[in-house]
Amino acid sequence: MPKPTARRLNWFRVITAVIMAVLCIAILYQLWMFSLVVWYAYRDPGSSAIMRQELARLRERDPEAELKYQWVPYDRISNTLKQAVVASEDANFTEHDGVEWDAIRKAWEYNQRQAERGRTKMRGGSTITQQLAKNLFLSGSRSYLRKGQELVLAYMIEHVMPKERILELYLNVAEWGVGVFGAEAAARHYYNTSAARLGAGQAARLAAMLPNPRYYDRHRNTGYLNSRTATLTRRMRMVEIP
């Protein structure tokens, strides 16, 4: 019969082996994600994690469903849309390194107060880079693990890609309605024009829709949307874009 000391030693070895295996898998996964970040620094994506998730959802009801999506390069997206989106989602986009911890803290405190009052409206503290990480690589699910991976990816993206490329990717994979992805598809879906020809008011309204695009696709004339559009129209000229 093995001695207690020997049994404890065997258990220690097993636990150590399991921990090392988990660490190796985690490191390999991060290396894989980093390789994808490098790939998309130079290659345009044909789809994204959020697109694939949404297409699967739509095809549960309609097997023939397709997404509206068309990639366009940075110089074929109007500066008005770039300004409006930065003003709406991340006014300090050109200055931070991917994550704004103060914004995350304020959003968390606000959401805690909302929850205590029984209110469902929450505020996000994610930068454009974080949103890109989620849209391109992850999913819409909410968990601490996914949020942690989003933060890691945001730093990877910022260290590999210039700001112009980050914004180009974001504008092309952002969700803008039911099955509508990217600036070009959004411009054609709502205004029957191209992303390059969007006016200031049109761009501001599209930017205002970003926090809840499926809802605003079905409710295009709410008081909040009109008010937010007016606010962004005033603010957008004051932000810096790459």
UniProtKB/Swiss-Prot annotation:
Main location: membrane
Transmembrane segments: 18-38
Pathway(s) of this molecule: Cell wall biogenesis; peptidoglycan biosynthesis
Cellular component aspect of the GO annotation: peptidoglycan-based cell wall; plasma membrane
Subcellular locations according to the entry: Cell inner membrane
Catalysed reactions listed for this entry: [GlcNAc-(1->4)-Mur2Ac(oyl-L-Ala-gamma-D-Glu-L-Lys-D-Ala-D-Ala)](n)-di-trans,octa-cis-undecaprenyl diphosphate + beta-D-GlcNAc-(1->4)-Mur2Ac(oyl-L-Ala-gamma-D-Glu-L-Lys-D-Ala-D-Ala)-di-trans,octa-cis-undecaprenyl diphosphate = [GlcNAc-(1->4)-Mur2Ac(oyl-L-Ala-gamma-D-Glu-L-Lys-D-Ala-D-Ala)](n+1)-di-trans,octa-cis-undecaprenyl diphosphate + di-trans,octa-cis-undecaprenyl diphosphate + H(+)
GO biological process: cell wall organization; peptidoglycan biosynthetic process; regulation of cell shape
Membrane topology of the entry: Single-pass membrane protein
SUPFAM superfamilies: Lysozyme-like (SSF53955)
Superkingdom to which the source organism belongs: Bacteria
Pfam families cross-referenced by the UniProt entry: Transgly (PF00912)
GO-annotated molecular function: pentosyltransferase activity; peptidoglycan glycosyltransferase activity
EC class (word): transferase
Stored InterPro entries: Glyco_trans_51, Lysozyme-like_dom_sf, PBP_transglycosylase, Pep_trsgly
The EC number(s) this enzyme carries: 2.4.99.28
Assigned keywords, A-Z: Cell inner membrane, Cell membrane, Cell shape, Cell wall biogenesis/degradation, Glycosyltransferase, Membrane, Peptidoglycan synthesis, Transferase, Transmembrane, Transmembrane helix
Function: Peptidoglycan polymerase that catalyzes glycan chain elongation from lipid-linked precursors.
Family matches, as NCBIfam families: mono_pep_trsgly
Family listed: Belongs to the glycosyltransferase 51 family.
HAMAP family associated with the record: PGT_MtgA
Protein name per its UniProtKB record: Biosynthetic peptidoglycan transglycosylase
